[in-house]
Amino acid sequence: MKNVKNLKILSIFLAAFWILQSLTLPISATEETELSETSASEEAAPTDSAPEEQEETEETGAPETVSPPAEAPLGGDESSNFGVDAPRALAGPDELDLDAEALLLLELNSQTMVYAKNIDTRREPASLTKVMTCLLALEHGNLTDSITVSQEALDDLDPAGSSSGLMAGEVFTLEQLLYCLMIESANDAAPVIAEYVAGSEPAFVEMMNQKAAELGCTGTHFANTHGLHDEEHYTTARDLAKIMMAALEYEKFQEIYSADRYTLAATNLQEERILVTTNYLIDASITSDYYDERVIGGKTGFTTPAGRCVMCVAESGNLRYLCVVLGASSTGADGSTYFGSFVSASEALDFGFDSFTFAEVLSPLAPIAQLPVAHATQSVAVTPAESVTTRTD
């Protein structure tokens, strides 16, 4: 009977421990945040060699947005701030007003939704679309496969859009095309990849929408593989975060999205060339106005309807943030070229890194209890299976 009693006690203790482990300690929003508004840089990026993504030739006006469900209020207990589907964020526009139609800031290690602004509002994502294109290529393709560019893949592209200058009949590996897609934001690489994976771009777009549904994206509908303007092509900041998190599970994606240069070897039709990133958060060689040493990778986007867009990941100390910016300014106060998405991303990251830290409260290396064992001289040490952290302000 004593053995049974001890086993019951042990079972109850372990059950309580696992419940504790599945929870984090209460989190409360910072009541006062001392932040001064950062004035936007009005200096334009040099235009002599900048590989800026090109907007569509035809002006299409302001983006049409679909009214989302009412967003939940800020603050709340810890469970309401947890995960990419969190109904609440710790802060929003009242605490920090940023140049963006929508902005999401998620701390990845703790899965804490730190900042949210219109994250369920449907907007055009421009070339952030290409993260989904890259994800499906990594999921279904072989990086070393040879792919021949078809004329059909190039026929419907806007010649003024961002491009790697692919030629019909030119042969690349899938890996090379993914670098074109992500580094130079090449519109011409997207349909070529789509034809390789699915046989046609429409079939690939169907796969994109199926994958979005699989990832729990409830405000997304893709109409093309590159992100150029289409009334039926839209997503949300929250959905883009889900897509980015899925892509980050691939080491090759992390390698590609963090590269600022790539040497594209000579092909059967063209000489060797160097691909240069459109992401000035990770590359200061063209302009240092937007460089942020904390940012380790990301993807940019821009069309006139979508505005400046960026998704990036940044690290500092024990914090790792995913930031999604949609609909930021593209023109400075003096009318010059301006990258409001980069400025807003850095300001959001400043807020996240400066306002919060995380401390380990339970460690797999430190026992939390010693349980006696009946008819034995030694006790059993109980330790967490994983580290448990909580936020400290």
Q: What is each model feature region?
A:
Residues 2-5, 49:
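Short, low-complexity interaction segments enriched in Ser/Thr/Pro/Gly
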Residues 217-218, 232-234, 238-393:
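Domain-terminus/edge residues, biased toward the C-terminal soluble/receptor-binding domains
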Residues 4-28:
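Sec-dependent N-terminal signal peptides of Gram-positive bacterial secreted proteins and lipoproteins
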Residues 20-32, 37, 42, 48, ...:
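Active-site-adjacent loops and short helices of periplasmic peptidoglycan-processing enzymes
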